[in-house]
């Protein structure tokens, strides 16, 4: 019987990543010090490189561009002992994750220190399972908006000294002005300190760029709290009427079935509501909104920022032409949470949900076709773009678009359904039902291997059957 292996063997020429805290060399473990002392090449930021003794070692700052530069750097120094210095725990929103994804677990050894996240939780007395981490390092501060909820505890990893004031301003704008903020600076170092206050009226001056903002979310009276469950109210979005309505949007997203790290194309995005709610489901989710109207495209960007997913990519153009080449372009990753600003990271070796990236070249996992269904070649272009296991959902409200979906259903199978919603409304002095426009929905999944329906088999009317008229 084989014995369990508690330590994976690492090749002698492996890249070693050493985590270092604000206390510098003095805070390193014996193992970490020995690793750094034995290095031929040290790679890291200027601050970290300055924390360790010079010795007989080559010190190199982060290359630019980051990812491509790292590959060149390690190739140049192949056969030498290369040590990378990183903040705290390199696998908590750090460069260790990037290196593992680039080179694999057998080529990278990690020697962690205590992360700023762990120190912040310890200072605040917050259990890990009862708080959420959001990084705005080199990112749009509006990413915090997705995580806001009454009673939520947030640890915001700051980009610089101005981040606390930006977070306070965002909290006030989103109706969380009563939230308490604690700015934890230089955690683990000699200059560690904490500033506290309330978001509304936050007037603390910017100080150390090395800070974590702890937020205890409190919703202001009368303010709206937005759920992460798909189906936000229509008035949560700025729109001109071109929006997939709330009830139908919730059902549409159930069919699109977002999973962590997956990519959606929202074709004919209108207000961007489907793409935005897709990204809100999980912080690693990505989306591209394709919209021909520049004014609507600008509106999508505003909606995405206001609803906490500013990394939504908006493409101004008409489909299907605008879809050409999209699978080979950069899509920002809403979950990238590096403690050092850097370009994105690739999909882990061996598959699995991606942990972060801005330079992926993958096909969409799902496509929502909300406009232009009747345009020749549109449905086929969307189907051709789908990756393995991909899902497509298309909506139609006109006879021409419905005919296109009926044809697609006859050709490819899947599911074809009609949805109608009626709402109670005043009818004179009484109340009656007001119907919304009936919507036809075609959904298709590559994973289902659905066969096209048989036409006119005698059991039920098929597409094009003369007996399919309403009765």
Each PLM stretch: what is its role?
Residues 386-387:
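Helix-to-beta-strand junctions that scaffold the AdoMet/dcAdoMet cofactor pocket
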Residues 271-283:
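Conserved SAM-binding loop of SAM-dependent methyltransferases across substrates and taxa
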Residues 1-114, 118-119, 141, 148, ...:
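Class I S-adenosyl-L-methionine
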Residues 196-210, 401-403, 408-452, 470-471:
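Active-site capping/gating segments
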Residues 261-270:
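Conserved class I S-adenosyl-L-methionine
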Residues 87-151, 320-321, 365-366, 410-434, ...:
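Class I SAM-dependent methyltransferase SAM-binding "motif I" and its flanking Rossmann-like core
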Residues 293-350, 354-361:
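S-adenosyl-L-methionine
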Residues 2-17, 30-33, 80-82, 150-242, ...:
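A contiguous loop/helix-start segment that scaffolds small-molecule binding in enzyme catalytic cores
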């Amino acid at each position: 019987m084989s014995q369990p292996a508690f330590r994976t063997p690492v090749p002698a020429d492996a890249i070693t990543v050493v985590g270092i805290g604000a206390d510098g060399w003095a805070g390193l473990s014996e193992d970490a010090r020995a690793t750094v002392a034995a290095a031929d090449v040290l790679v890291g930021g200027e601050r970290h490189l300055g924390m360790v003794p010079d010795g007989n070692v080559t010190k190199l700052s982060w290359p630019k561009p980051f990812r491509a530069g790292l590959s060149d750097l390690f190739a140049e120094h192949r056969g030498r002992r290369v040590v990378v210095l990183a903040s705290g725990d390199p696998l908590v929103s750090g460069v260790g994750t990037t290196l593992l994804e680039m080179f694999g677990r057998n080529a990278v050894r990690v020697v962690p220190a205590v992360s700023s996240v762990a120190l912040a939780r310890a200072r605040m007395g917050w259990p890990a399972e009862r708080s959420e981490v959001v990084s705005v390092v080199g990112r749009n501060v509006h990413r915090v908006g997705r995580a806001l909820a009454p009673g939520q505890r947030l640890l915001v990893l700051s980009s610089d000294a101005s981040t606390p004031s930006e977070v306070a301003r965002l909290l006030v704008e989103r109706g969380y002005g009563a939230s308490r903020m604690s700015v934890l600076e230089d955690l683990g170092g000699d200059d560690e300190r904490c500033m506290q206050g309330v978001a509304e009226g936050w007037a603390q001056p910017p100080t150390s760029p090395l800070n974590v903002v702890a937020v205890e979310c409190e919703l202001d009276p009368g303010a709206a709290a937005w759920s992460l469950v798909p189906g936000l109210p229509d008035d949560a979005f700025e729109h001109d009427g071109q929006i997939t309505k709330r009830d139908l949007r919730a059902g549409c997203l159930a069919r699109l079935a977002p999973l962590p790290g997956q990519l959606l194309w929202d074709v004919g995005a209108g207000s961007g509501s489907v793409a935005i709610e897709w990204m809100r489901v999980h912080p690693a989710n990505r989306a591209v909104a394709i919209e021909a109207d520049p004014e609507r495209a600008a509106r999508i960007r505003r909606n995405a920022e206001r609803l906490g997913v500013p990394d939504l990519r908006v493409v101004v153009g008409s489909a299907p032409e605008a879809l050409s080449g999209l699978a080979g372009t950069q899509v920002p990753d809403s979950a990238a949470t590096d403690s050092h600003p850097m370009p994105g990271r690739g999909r882990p070796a061996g598959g699995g949900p991606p942990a972060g990236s801005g330079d992926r070249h993958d096909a969409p996992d799902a496509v929502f076709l909300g406009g232009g269904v009747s345009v020749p070649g549109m449905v086929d272009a969307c189907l051709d773009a789908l990756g393995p296991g991909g899902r497509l959902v298309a909506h139609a409200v006109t006879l021409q678009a419905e005919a296109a979906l009926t044809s697609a259903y006859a050709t490819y199978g899947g599911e074809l359904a009609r949805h109608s919603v009626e709402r109670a409304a005043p009818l004179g002095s009484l109340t009656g039902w007001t119907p919304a426009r009936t919507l036809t929905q075609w959904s298709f999944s590559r994973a289902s291997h659905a066969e096209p329906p048989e036409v006119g088999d005698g059991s039920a009317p098929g597409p094009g059957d003369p007996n399919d008229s309403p009765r």
